[in-house]
Amino acid sequence: MIFAKGHGTQNDFVLLPDVDAELVLTAARVAALCDRRKGLGADGVLRVTTAGAAQAVGVLDSLPEGVRVTDWYMDYRNADGSAAQMCGNGVRVFAHYLRASGLEVRDEFVVGSLAGPRPVTCHHVEAAYADVSVDMGKANRLGAGEAVVGGRRFHGLAVDVGNPHLACVDSQLTVDGLAALDVGAPVSFDGAQFPDGVNVEVLTAPVDGAVWMRVHERGVGETRSCGTGTVAAAVAALAAVGSPTGTLTVHVPGGEVVVTVTDATSFLRGPSVLVARGDLADDWWNAMG
């Protein structure tokens, strides 16, 4: 069984090319694959298929709004095996893989997801490296919220980027203070406000067009980066200074991306790296349940 390993600003994924959606992706198999000791290790799994194939085998009960049968479909699973609506870093790596592997020849095309269609532009593509931007759709502000991260209470802005986020801008937080925060510890939040859980970002206030961010992803824990989280962070940071639109560079532990927020949509641009390709042992895969 063929796989590839890639990352977007060190948010890493195992890609499983499965155009006809024939693989059975149980939660146990995904979790084992993402385990950094038992498996290959990753923050999530990206099945590379089409929307029509995913619907035909029951991965999708129906096509997400705006997604066409012929669109590529990113079947994204968190490290715990749960399905996820969207992953901004994952879309960039997914698009890079399609182009680098020859499955796609266009520089501009649509990647479908549970959150809907995501148009991508591949600005530069090599076998290992790419520069990709994604139209992430409109990021919707959902009001104020609170979370406890690393033993500290933060006030934030709830933002829907196809998945739920609570982006907490702290004007007193320094880059060093952010680095010292225990973001990997369990976070707490209002379960009534976020019944399905939430991704929590903690970030500095914008300075010279840039913010620094760390993220605790639901179903994963702290990751080196989160694409949708950087969009939520940019929305919250711009709102904190009274600007509903604008462009910010978002620094994360794994690198940096550029987020542009407009009245109608948002764009995420950043790198993708394809690290390896190989074969999974069928006996191991089958034994994982």
Curated annotation (Swiss-Prot):
Annotated binding of substrate, by residue: 11, 78, 88-89, 163, 199, 217-218, 227-228
Main location class: cytoplasm
Site positions (Could be important to modulate the pK values of the two catalytic cysteine residues): 165, 217
EC number per UniProt: 5.1.1.7
GO biological process, one term: lysine biosynthetic process via diaminopimelate
Pfam families: DAP_epimerase
Activity regulation annotation text: Inhibited by sulphydryl alkylating agents, 2-nitro-5-thiocyanatobenzoate (NTCB), 5,50-dithiobis(2-nitrobenzoic acid) (DTNB) and 1,2-benzisothiazolidine 3-one (BIT) at nanomolar concentrations.
Remaining remarks: Was identified as a high-confidence drug target.
Protein name, per record: Diaminopimelate epimerase
Recorded name of the encoding gene: dapF
